[in-house]
Amino acid sequence: MTAKHHLELTQVGIDFPTPKGPFTALTDVNLRINKGEFISLIGHSGCGKSTVLNIIAGLHKATKGGVILDGQEVNEPGPERAVVFQNHSLLPWLTAYKNVELAVKQTSKGRSKAEMRDWIEHNLELVHMSHAVDKLPAEISGGMKQRVGIARALAMEPKVLLMDEPFGALDALTRAHLQDSIMEIHADLGNTVVMITHDVDEAVLLSDRIVMMTNGPSATIGEVLNIELPRPRDRLALADNPQYNHYRHDVLTFLYEKQRKVESVAAHRKKSQDGAKGVQENVA
């Protein structure tokens, strides 16, 4: 595979062993991502969104095809790809500062202690957590924990920030504040982001492109929607924006109409095949 883009997924497929034989979770996933793009993956539960993210992260290895980042094939986890999960995954016995420091020590071995301290404080400031550097996870809210998790990921200076439903467990107001923070950080850093979400409004608000997945098994990319809304984006202004609502409608149409038709056709085809098989068996 030759690299033409920042991040490339080419003919990616993955099978998982089961007692009844291989289960094909993904098939023929092709995606080209440019440096600095914000990509959202959306689809129904079980469509393979997290599997795609895990393959990019190097946590799963594709059965077919592969992933290339800046000319290098991805086969295992690496610091150039930082992951933020729905669960913040902070170490409970370490302060916010120490949790970020742990990641920085693994990726910034050339920095002096003073430089390392400045870098940790800078990333905590990016997510508006400077006031809580000495707090343990148990002493801060769920939204604050997730902010620290994002700071920890950013402090690794990854080429790609991978986020698996990072705001899914938060209340609506906290989620909105974090979405605004992510937009600010993305504007400041210009980093590449791949995010999984179930939230249509979140996808349209944050993304440059929305990748819509078909339902599994053998899930793949159904459609890719370009979001041509100017940045910076204001959620209140967008609420009455016809183009915003058009994009929102397109995603909902794919998820709740087109997928239903696809499933209906597939079910009808399977029923016809089963019926034909039964006739053949009776004739035999």
Give the label of every model feature segment.
Residues 2-6, 15-28:
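A short, flexible loop at the N-terminus of ABC-type nucleotide-binding domains that lies
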Residues 136-140, 144:
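Conserved ABC ATPase signature
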Residues 112-132, 184:
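Conserved ABC ATPase "signature" region
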Residues 57:
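Helix-to-loop junction immediately C-terminal to a conserved catalytic motif
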Residues 65-76:
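Conserved ABC transporter NBD signature motif
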Residues 42-44:
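The feature captures the beta-strand-to-loop junction immediately N-terminal to the Walker
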Residues 155-159:
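A short, proline-enriched helix->beta-strand linker immediately N-terminal to the Walker B motif
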Residues 94-103:
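Short coil-to-helix segment of the ABC ATPase nucleotide-binding domain corresponding to the Q-loop/switch region
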